[in-house]
Amino acid sequence: MIKISNLTKRFDKTVALDRLYLEIGDGITGLVGENGAGKSTLLRCIAGILNPEEGEIFIDGKPRGVLEAKQEIYFLSDYPYSPKAGTIDSIYGFYSCFYDFDLDRFHEILSHFSLPPKGKIVDFSKGMRRQLFIALALSSRTKYLLMDEAFDGLDPIALDEIKGEILKEKENGRSIFVSSHNISTLERLADRFVMLSKGRLAENAETQSLGRNFVKYQAYFETNPTEEQLRSLCNLVSYRKVGSVLNFVMEESAEDLEKIKAAFPPKFIEQVEIDADELVTLAMIKARKDLHQ
């Protein structure tokens, strides 16, 4: 288990992480939050690339700075380093100086892609680089894998292959902590979500419970209530008008819905489905309001 206690990280006067307490256990944990929420900073602190001003990080009970703890963590950054003249073979050799790898597993993952074995990595597209470095990360023999913007640049076919390989690693007992703006992919992979907002923990929930108390309605009123009027009648999360139709999301409450209907009798109202991307976005909006109100 990775245990984080009272973690604070500042950049000049900007507080990137603010007294963060968190435990990361087995399985796949998704890390989400708006830009600037502190996701990359958190991953880099766990990996030992950044040092916090306050707080502690323990890896299976060992302080993060000791060798035994460092050897259990592989960090895949959003733009990993590669020598200018590096090829697939040379980059494997370079990273093998720092980590223990399973070469057969590395080639097994690479077999899903069409990367030129002798091509220079500097000439690879963003997606090709991502395929290579994900293969490298997944073939490392560390217990913990940290992945920053893991799916950025991957085409749908490569993304499906990578998802399958990540699930294999989970089945083999690895703990994976992954950030991504690709919420729909992350929602299908993650066992739980950690959500940051302005450096603070906004949510730490099992995937199936994240935002499940939200309901979305599509309605047509003779006179649309304003956002402020709706907010006075329910725990409003989102409000949007499309022409004469009003879409709004509220925390589930049959009593509040009846209050809305009584105050503004609708000509038409129906509950509509919330997809994974919107669900996480709504949870982020709600968490930000709760933290900073």
At which residue positions do the language-model features occur?
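C-terminal coupling/interaction segments
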Residues: 244-293
